[in-house]
């Protein structure tokens, strides 16, 4: 079952949920597997999520890129928003447009996650710092995720920097903390300069 099955009454909303095989309290609701082009109204999505919300502490809605129908369906059902961007200028322009649209919705908060951040490039002044990005976009920073080649290749990297950053991000969301992962810590000092040189040569 998927979201459309629940909307059209072929199953109850909870029957459309798929439990994660490793985490008993994590469930996934597929959006529309069989008819991806079928129109689904924001109101219908909201009804399903309202039905499920008493069962969960958090419902995360993964929003498609761009400001199309899928974006508005997701935002219309949300109470808060997390804008995910990368430090690249084109991505920041897109994020700025998204934030402008989000302001038209009555959301409790709009916060920022910066993905694929390279600490070596920050130290060398090749990309904006997370604080500069947050200041430009005028929304608070809630987390940073460093670029991790293992994640990029689809590998499971236990104990890696990306995992540590995600744990801090989860704590910030769940407990209202503001602990931001330091992506530059490996690139300071003598050995850090060697790491930066090696990173550039790859």
Describe the function of each predicted region:
Residues 14, 42, 46, 89-96, ...:
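Amphipathic alpha-helical transducer elements in NTP-driven molecular machines
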Residues 27, 57, 79, 110, ...:
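Conserved acidic residues
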Residues 51-54, 68-89:
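Inter-motif core of Ras-like GTPase G domains
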Residues 61, 83, 111-114:
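Structural beta-sheet core signal
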